[in-house]
């Protein structure tokens, strides 16, 4: 890995609103409407008032609204209550929770509890809200697990949708008492929240992609997102470290006019030129004979596509299959893109067959026992599985982040710097290892190659 750092340094050197009330609604659960249920009955079941239920679900206030079987209803907590790690409310009896568990309610705040805040669009009005609901549920599952180890938390969650003035949320009395906040989702909300966290010495975890450079000046920020430019640099450096001296690179033109990976392939070719590494160019439109002549018979070949999409990848697999049939002794590896994880259910055998490497910051391993266990708990707790639409899985992202940061705060308190060495936790999907940006905050520096080996096993090569 020492050479990886050398290559990375060399490359771097060379180169909609809701009302104010709705914006701060806090809710604790999501209820799936059953046949013949009424708004009154649901409110009574959870110990909330009908107006509180309506405020948490603005669609209910629209003229002509009818409660239908299968609708998802957001359940707020009553005003005198607070979230517990299991999503229940202090001072209120939740019939569903009572039926599931014999754990006693905690009427008073736990001593030395880590106070966790979540400020995200927690609603079911659009894709952003649904993703963040799943992410938040993952956080709750993590905090439940930590509770079994004696790590106590208090959770305060606010629905902060797009267009909301987050400063209104920050007026809530519990906000300034938090130890850590996860959020926001939208870039325009970052600065006021970051300034607030700095003023009250609260750790701020920005979990998803944002624009802006607040992390460069605010020491309370932990920014999970890495820029595309940074990830491209790391992907190129790891390619050079692993393949430059041992493999023959071949670039395949996929004729994809909407490709999103052109910057990577162009920059990689420039670096190979500077390093005086010979490579070949071919195309999916080439004849089999012309395609074959670009592959070296005396050393391994590494193939790079200029497209991240599934149809083009499938064409490449067909082309390589014909090549291997004609020249079975040819050694081939693929260097891909994290979008390929989405197609894993269809192409897994091909990934193994062609010794595939995928540069990424995460890997969703659905075959892992721990992953299966968490997915089963999620379904049991929330009555539905995690969405298959998202990779990385949103709930597992929330789970990993909560585990990492709460453990880090428990062990190190305010001195927690976000390094992997400070936290004894093996993530299910995403590793975290933060580095400081000057005198500002911290950015996740984790990077890995996920290697699908020809013996049908896998390895994570962490840089």
Regions found by a protein language model. Name each.
Residues 2-8, 23-52, 56-463:
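Extracytosolic ligand-binding ectodomains
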Residues 11-14:
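Short, linear, compositionally biased motifs with a strong N-terminal bias
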Residues 17-18:
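N-terminal signal peptide c-region/cleavage motif recognized by signal peptidases
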């Amino acid at each position: 890995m020492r050479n990886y750092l050398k290559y990375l340094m060399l490359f771097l050197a060379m180169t909609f609103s809701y009302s104010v009330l709705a914006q701060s609604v806090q809710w604790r659960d999501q209820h799936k409407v059953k046949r013949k249920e009424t708004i009154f009955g649901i409110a009574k079941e959870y110990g909330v008032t009908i107006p509180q239920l309506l405020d948490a679900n603005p669609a209910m206030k629209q003229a002509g609204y009818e409660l239908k079987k299968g609708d998802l209803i957001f359940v707020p907590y009553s005003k005198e209550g607070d979230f517990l790690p299991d999503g229940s409310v202090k001072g209120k009896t939740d019939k569903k929770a009572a039926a599931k568990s014999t754990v006693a309610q905690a009427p008073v705040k736990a001593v030395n509890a880590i106070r966790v805040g979540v400020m995200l669009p927690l609603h079911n009005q659009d894709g952003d809200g649904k993703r963040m609901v799943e992410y938040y549920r993952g956080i709750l599952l993590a905090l439940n697990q930590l509770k079994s180890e004696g790590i106590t938390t208090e959770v305060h969650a606010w629905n902060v949708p797009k267009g909301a003035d987050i400063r209104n949320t920050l007026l809530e009395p519990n906000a300034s008492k938090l130890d850590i906040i996860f959020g926001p989702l939208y870039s325009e909300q970052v600065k006021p929240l970051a300034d607030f966290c700095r003023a009250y010495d609260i750790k701020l975890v920005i979990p998803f992609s944002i624009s802006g450079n607040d992390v460069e000046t605010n020491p309370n920020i932990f920014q999970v997102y890495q820029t595309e430019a940074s990830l491209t640099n790391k992907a190129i450096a790891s390619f050079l470290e692993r393949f430059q001296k041992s493999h023959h690179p071949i670039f395949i033109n996929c004729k994809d006019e909407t490709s999103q990976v052109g910057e990577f392939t162009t920059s990689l070719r420039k670096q190979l030129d500077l390093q005086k590494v010979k490579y070949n160019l071919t195309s999916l439109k080439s004849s089999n004979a012309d395609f074959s002549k670009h592959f070296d018979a005396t050393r391994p070949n590494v193939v790079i596509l200029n497209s991240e999409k599934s149809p083009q990848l499938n064409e490449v697999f067909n082309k390589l299959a014909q090549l291997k049939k004609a020249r079975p002794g040819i050694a081939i590896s693929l260097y891909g893109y994290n979008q390929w994880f989405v197609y894993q259910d269809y192409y897994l055998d091909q990934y193994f067959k062609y010794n595939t490497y995928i540069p990424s910051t995460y890997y969703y391993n659905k075959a892992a026992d721990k992953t299966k266990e968490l997915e089963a708990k999620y379904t049991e707790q929330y009555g539905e599985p995690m969405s298959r639409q998202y990779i990385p899985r949103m709930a597992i992202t929330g789970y990993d982040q909560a585990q990492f940061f709460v453990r880090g705060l428990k062990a190190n308190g305010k001195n927690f710097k976000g390094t992997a060495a400070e936290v004894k936790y093996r993530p299910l999907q995403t590793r975290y290892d933060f580095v400081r940006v000057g005198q500002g905050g911290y950015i996740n520096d984790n990077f890995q190659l996920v290697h699908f080996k020809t013996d049908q096993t896998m390895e994570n090569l962490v840089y």
